[in-house]
UniProtKB/Swiss-Prot annotation:
SMART domains: JAB_MPN (SM00232). Belongs to the eIF-3 subunit F family. It comes from the Eukaryota. Residues 12-149 form the MPN domain. This is Eukaryotic translation initiation factor 3 subunit F-2. One of its GO terms (molecular function) is translation initiation factor binding. It comes from Drosophila pseudoobscura pseudoobscura. The gene is eIF3f2.
Length: 288
């Protein structure tokens, strides 16, 4: 299924990472830029037609004309960012563009024409995020353009809504649960994240509790305290057979290697975070 075969019943799956990237771009925008826009990346399954928006990046632009109906994009920046993104994630393709605002902008037709060429295989999507927090919600909608007009007469585009779901993968669920706990029980140091190793400890404790529950269930079956359930038995069998048999010494070596990699990643990410904070403060000092 290509993007040109969209109908108003097509469903789009949006990864939460995209929302956070748009919010981050909006918070970091220049003072004279009221809204942000950028390129959407993702995949379209050929057989099922499942559309997933998995990534995005903002694009430098300038609005002009009456009611900001015209737009100039930094095409070199857009192409460079697209090349870098496809080096990291070659399976992701251009699906359309995002923008912030309360409604579809007057420049949407020009953007549609540009991203129609970028998509190569059909019609682009338009993700609109309302950052005004009306009703304490950040309303997010997906549009596709539908051609309107009469044969031989004036033609135009009408942006129609598509159904959309927020898709949470396993890593997304872990991150959202962590953020939920942080919101419910904020730390004294505002904005401070718990060390990643504490998340590993929490996950290990959770696995230990589930293993204890499984062991109690098996012991109750063996001691005839509870009736066996074939469905549960098959599920446990599938879980156990899916785990490869690894010697204790080899497992310890693998675990320690992964832990060293994690510590190295934490060190590098902390250095990058510090460098970004210094760069942002220096930039603010120059602007002031």
């Amino acid at each position: 299924m290509s993007l040109s075969n969209f109908n108003l019943q097509s469903k789009v799956l949006l990864h939460p990472l995209v929302l956070f990237q748009i919010i981050d771009a909006y918070e970091r925008r220049a003072k004279d830029v009221p809204e942000v826009l950028g390129t959407l990346l993702g995949t379209v399954a050929g057989k099922t037609g499942r559309i997933e928006i998995t990534n995005c990046f903002s694009v430098v632009h300038r609005m002009h004309g009456d009611n900001n109906c015209h737009i100039d994009l930094d095409l070199k920046y857009d192409n460079d960012m697209l090349e870098l993104a496809q080096i990291a994630y070659p399976q992701e393709k251009v699906l359309g563009w995002f923008s912030t605002g309360k409604s579809v902008s007057a420049a949407a037709v020009e953007l549609h024409e540009y991203y129609e060429r970028q998509c190569h295989n059909g019609q682009p999507l338009h993700l609109l995020m309302d950052t005004s927090l009306r009703g304490q919600r950040m309303n997010t909608r997906i549009f596709c353009a539908v051609a309107t007009g009469v044969p031989g007469g004036t033609k135009g585009l009408m942006f129609s809504l598509l159904p959309m779901d927020i898709y949470f993968g396993s890593p997304d669920i872990v991150a959202m649960r962590h953020m939920g706990r942080q919101c419910a029980q904020p730390t004294k140091d505002a904005g401070r994240l718990l060390p990643e190793l504490e998340q590993v400890v929490d996950a290990t404790k959770d696995i230990q509790q589930k293993l204890d529950l499984v062991l109690r269930y098996i012991n109750d079956i063996l001691n005839r305290k509870r009736r066996p359930d074939n469905t549960v038995g098959r599920a446990l069998h599938d879980v156990l057979t899916s785990v490869p048999m690894v010697e204790a010494e080899r497992f310890r070596h693998m675990f320690n290697t992964n832990m060293r990699d994690l510590l190295m990643s934490l060190t590098l990410s902390s250095m990058i975070k510090t460098q970004l904070q210094l760069s942002e403060r220096l930039s603010n000092m120059v602007d002031a």
